[in-house]
C-alpha cells in the first residue's frame, strides 16, 4: 500500500511539473483568467467593429491571424510573436536583429537591449526586447486538435474501452464514469483531483498559465504597480505592498478603457475618411478651375488679336503655376491622409479583434502595445478641410487693348490674402476692381500627425510637406506676388520622413548622416518637445534653418504610454537637436516642455518650407501667439495650461514655477484658488509693524494679486505697459519714477523692497501706472484703451476679492519712496520678458 501511495504521489508531481512547463510563457509574465467580457466592453467592441471600415479587404483581416511573411496561420509550434506595431509573425520569419551601435555607445546598454528588428509587414524598426509572444494565437492552433483527441480518448483503468469523461491529475490517466466512482471510493485515490476531460482550462476554454517561480500557482492577480500578472505567493513577496486587482476586475476595467479608446479612434477615423473624400473632390475642382481660367484667357486674347498673344501665354503659365501648386499640395495631402487612414484601419481592426476575443490573458499582456497605438492615433491633429479659394481671369477690353504689355493678371483667392502672378501690376488707368478680397475663401486642411510614409507620389522632388494655408483675414488693398515661403524647423519625439516605398508608416530609430537616415523614435512619458518655425533667414544648423530637401513631417500630440524608450543618441554636428517654441493643437492634453537639457528626445525634425499667409492678429484668428509665451511673446521652454492652452515660460508665470508641472497642470488664471483663511489683524501701509518686521500680503491675497497681475500680462491691450521704464537699473526712489507691469511684478515677488502689504496698495500702483501712461499719450484711441484697461483691472480685482471695491484706490496715491534693491532689468523680469 505504501508503495502504491508513493507511486501515485510521484505521478502527481510529474503531471504538475509537466502542466507548469507547458503553460508558463516564455517571458515569465503569463496570465490566467477566465472572466467573460463585461457588457460595457462588449458594447464598446461592437461599436469599434461598426466604426471599422468595411473596405479593409480580406488581406488586411488575414494579417491578424496569419504570419505577415509566410502567410501561414499562426500556431503555437511556430512561436507567434507580436511586434509593437501590432503586426504578427512567426519567430523564424522575423529577420535577424541588428545592433544599434550608436545607442549602445551613448548609454552603455547591452547589445541585446539595443538590437533592432524590422517588421516584415510595415518595415517599422523596433527593439527586439519590445517584441512579445502573441498570446492571442498561443492556444488557437492546438484547440481543435486537443478537442478531437479528447473526444476519441478511452479509459485506461478498465478493459471496457469506455470513452473517458474525466482526468485524474495525480495519476495522469483518463477515466470513465465507472472508474471515477471507483477512484473516489479507494482510500489512496479518493483525495485525487479529478477534472473533466482535457488539460487545465478556465471557464472560457483558456489555458491556465502558472507562475515561473511557483510552479503550482496560477497567475490570478494583476499588479497595477508593475503592470503584470502575478500569483498569490509573488504578490505577498516580490510585489508586497503593491496595488493589485483580481483578474476579473482587471479584465473588466481594461476592456472598458480599451473600448472607449477604440470608439474615439473610430469616430476620428470616420472624420478622416470624410476629409479624404473632400480633398479628392478639391483636386478635381482645382483642375476644373484651371481649365476655366485657361479658356477665359484664350477668349480674351482672341478679342485683341496678335498684340496680346505673348501676354496671354504668360497669363496661362501663371494660372498653371497657381493651380498646379495647389493641386500638388492637395495630392500630397490626400496621399498622406490615405496612409494615415490605412494605419488607423489596422489599429481599429486589431483593437476590435482583441476586444472581441475571449482570451483575457492576451488582452492584458498586450494592452500596453494597444494603448500606445490607440493613444498616438487619437493625438494626431487633423483639421477640417476647408473649401478652396476661387480663381478667375479679370480684364477690361477697352482699357487693356491700349496696354497690351500690362494685360491681365491671374487672381487666386486664398484665406488671409490674395496672390497674383509675378507679372506687372495693372496700370493706374485700368478701370474696375482689380481683385476680390479672400476673407470668405479658404484652403484645404493641414495634416499634423506622427507618422512618416513612403514617397510614391510623383512630386517627390518638391517640398513634400502636406500643409494647407493657415486661416487669417486679409486687410484692405491688394497683395501681389507669390506667397512667401517660410522655412520651419521642429523637434519632435517622433522624427519621420517620406521614403520611396508605399508601405504603411515606418519608424526610423537613429539619426543618420543623410537625408534618408534622419530618423529617430523617442517615446517618453509626459513630455513632448515641439517647435514652430520663425520667418527670416538664419544660418544653417540654427533654429529656423532651411530644411533639407526631400524631408517632410507631420506632427503628433503627446502620448501617455512609453514602450521601451531608447536612450538618447549622442549629439554630434549632424544630430544636434534644434529647440524652438512649443506648438500644440486644441486637442492637446497637459503641459508640454521643450527643453535643450534634461530630455531624452534628440530627434531632429525638418519641415519643408510651407506657403503661409502674412500673420494677421485679431479675434478668432490663428496666429503665432499659439506657439509663444503668452506673457513675453517669445519662444523658448514653455509649459501649456491644460484648460486655456496658454503657454508660459517657467519664470513668466505668476507665481514662478520652480519645476516642470504635471500633466494636468492649470495656470493661475484657470486654477481655482483654495479657500485660504486670512490672517487675523490688519497690516499697516508703512512697510513695518511695531516689531520692525516688514509687512507682507497674506498667502491668500498674494495668490489673488498674482492672478490679477498675470491676467494683465496676458491681456493684449496691456502689451505696451509691460516695460515703460528706460533706465538700465529699475529704481522707484524718485517720486516721478515710471511704473510698469515689470516693476509691479518685481515688488509683488519681493524683488523690490518694501513688498506690498495690502491689495489696496497693489491696486494703487496699477492705477498710478495707468495714469502715467495716459499722460504719455495724446492719441484718443489710447485714452479709450486706458479706460477699458481700468475697467478690466477693476473687474478682475472684484472677482478675486469678492465684494471689495477698488474704484476709490485707482487714483494716483502720494508717491512712495521705495528703496531700490539695485536690481537690473534682467533680474526683475523673466528670461523672456521684454517690450
Curated annotation (Swiss-Prot):
Sequence segments annotated as region (Involved in binding PPP1CA): 368-372
GO cellular component assignments: chromatin; euchromatin; heterochromatin; nucleoplasm; nucleus; protein-containing complex; RNA polymerase II transcription regulator complex
Class of enzymatic activity (EC top level): transferase
Cellular compartment(s): Nucleus
Region (HP1 box): 477-514
Residues that bear Citrulline: 471, 473
Chain positions of motif PxVxL motif: 482-495
Zinc finger (B box-type): 150-197, 206-247
SUPFAM superfamilies, per database record: B-box zinc-binding domain, FYVE/PHD zinc finger, RING/U-box
Keyword Glycosyltransferase appears in the UniProt entry: no
Occurrences of domain Bromo (ranges): 696-800
GO MF annotation, one: SUMO transferase activity
Keyword entries, A-Z: Acetylation, ADP-ribosylation, Bromodomain, Chromatin regulator, Citrullination, Coiled coil, Isopeptide bond, Metal-binding, Nucleus, Phosphoprotein, Repeat, Repressor, Transcription, Transcription regulation, Transferase, Ubl conjugation, Ubl conjugation pathway, Zinc, Zinc-finger
Region of interest called Leucine zipper alpha helical coiled-coil region, as start-end residue ranges on this chain: 248-378
Catalyzed reactions: S-ubiquitinyl-[E2 ubiquitin-conjugating enzyme]-L-cysteine + [acceptor protein]-L-lysine = [E2 ubiquitin-conjugating enzyme]-L-cysteine + N(6)-ubiquitinyl-[acceptor protein]-L-lysine
Positions carrying Phosphoserine: 24, 27, 31, 52, 140, 419, 439, 441, 472, 474, 480, 490, 502, 595, 684, 690, 698, 753, 758, 785, 825
UniProt xrefs under Pfam families: PHD, zf-B_box, zf-RING_5
Enzyme Commission number(s) of this protein: 2.3.2.27
Domain of life: Eukaryota
Record pathway: Protein modification; protein sumoylation
Matching InterPro entries: Bbox_C (IPR003649), Bromodomain (IPR001487), Bromodomain-like_sf (IPR036427), KAP1 (IPR037373), TIF1b_Bbox1_Znf (IPR047059), TIF1b_Bbox2_Znf (IPR047058), TIF1beta_RING-HC (IPR042713), Zinc_finger_PHD-type_CS (IPR019786)
PANTHER family: TRANSCRIPTION INTERMEDIARY FACTOR, TRIPARTITE MOTIF CONTAINING 28
UniProt protein name: Transcription intermediary factor 1-beta
